[in-house]
UniProtKB/Swiss-Prot annotation:
Keywords: Cell projection, Coiled coil, Cytoplasm. It is found in: Cytoplasm; Cell projection, Cilium. It comes from the Eukaryota. The lineage of its organism: Eukaryota, Metazoa, Chordata, Craniata, Vertebrata. GO terms for cellular component: cytoplasm; sperm midpiece. This is Coiled-coil domain-containing protein 172. PANTHER family: COILED-COIL DOMAIN-CONTAINING PROTEIN 172. May interact with TEKT2. Belongs to the CCDC172 family.
């Protein structure tokens, strides 16, 4: 193979090295972009986790409060049932007393009237009896008013329980939405990690290319052949070109550059 053809191959190899450097830059740029995306996704995930934990804490507090209110509601309902039963009993007793009182009043008035007609006794006792009966009826009416007020209070408490149940449903819906967002962020993080691993593998493949590239191997064999034929000057020139080519094909790593700069010159 002529020296001119060899130089043409070296130039072609330099073009390949430039293409490899371009690919390496693109790979590094893509890795940087993916790392930024992973970092942002991780930060977003952390923020969403904090928000979700806060919402869960609030929901737990509201649930605990709701359970307490339910317990109170059950107690109030039992008390309401007892009050209603007692009210019905009292109303029945009141009605019976009213009927009995009316009958007794009519009978007593008739007896007093008859007795008065017979013996002409004053009617003050009749008036006093009526006043006592009216006072008893007023007491019964007052008890009925107290029962009605207690029933209205129970109805107001039930309205508050309905409002808390509505708030619980809204918090559960918001929790479901946050869980969906969290799943999307986890999927994006997994995808970004897979892309990063692929790019790292591509970077390793490009770094190892000079050791397995057929063109580099062939050039080294030709250098060995020239060295065997004692072509010292041609050998040194080709050796310098090969060193430059290997440097061009190798990844631009500061540690690699430092190690190459301390290697002894080839003879």
């Amino acid at each position: 193979m002529s020296l001119e053809s060899l130089f043409q191959h070296i130039i072609f190899s330099e073009h390949q090295a430039e293409e490899s450097r371009r690919v390496m830059r693109e790979v590094r740029s893509e890795i940087t972009r993916c790392r930024g995306k992973i970092k942002k996704a991780t930060e977003d995930l952390s923020e969403e986790k904090i928000k979700l934990e806060s919402k869960v804490q609030q929901l737990s507090e509201k649930s605990f409060l709701l359970e307490l209110l339910k317990t109170h509601e059950n107690a109030l309902e039992r008390q309401l049932s007892e009050i209603i039963s007692e009210r019905d009993t009292l109303l029945q007793a009141c009605e019976a007393i009213k009927n009995k009182t009316t009958e007794e009043e009519e009978r007593f008035i008739k007896e007093i009237t008859d007795f008065n007609d017979n013996y002409e006794i004053t009617k003050k006792r009749d008036t006093l009896m009526k006043e006592n009966i009216e006072m008893e009826m007023a007491d019964l009416d007052s008890q009925a008013d107290v029962l009605r007020r207690e029933m209205k209070s129970v109805e107001r408490n039930r309205g508050q329980l309905w409002e808390l149940q509505k708030l619980k449903n809204e918090l559960l819906q918001e929790l479901f939405t946050l869980q969906k967002k969290l799943k999307v962020l986890k999927d994006e993080e997994t995808e970004a990690i897979c892309i990063t691993k692929q790019l790292e593998a591509e970077k390793t493949k490009v770094r190892d290319k000079p050791q397995h590239d057929p063109e580099c191997v062939r050039l080294k064999r030709e250098l060995d052949l020239y060295k065997a034929e004692d072509m010292e000057s041609v050998y040194r020139a080709l050796q310098a070109e090969v060193d430059l080519l290997e440097l061009a094909l190798a990844p631009k790593d500061p540690q690699d550059s430092n190690s190459l700069s301390h290697e002894p010159p080839h003879t």
